Amino acid sequence: MAHEGYHEPIEDLSAETREMHRAIISLMEELEAVDWYNQRVDACKDTSLKEILIHNRDEEKEHAAMLIEWIRRKDSIFAKELKDYLFTDKPITDHHE
């Protein structure tokens, strides 16, 4: 699986690649946590527990957003793609050049 670790010898990887890997793995974990909390919220019958789970899920979304921003600042191509696709009302598939 993609989250299990490096696919190349770590000694062959630059510090920048290792840091980006760390950020990407962290982002994957945050998004996985959002998914798990969504499922827990749907299944939860106790109103007060459901409120806590919703709060926790939304915190994970904040963490994911912070990681996306870090990646954007470090990767100019990713930044360009985010600029093209985010915060627009154009159909998602109409962005191709």
Where is each model-derived feature located?
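Iron-associated oxidoreductase/ferritin-like identity signal
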Residues: M1-E97
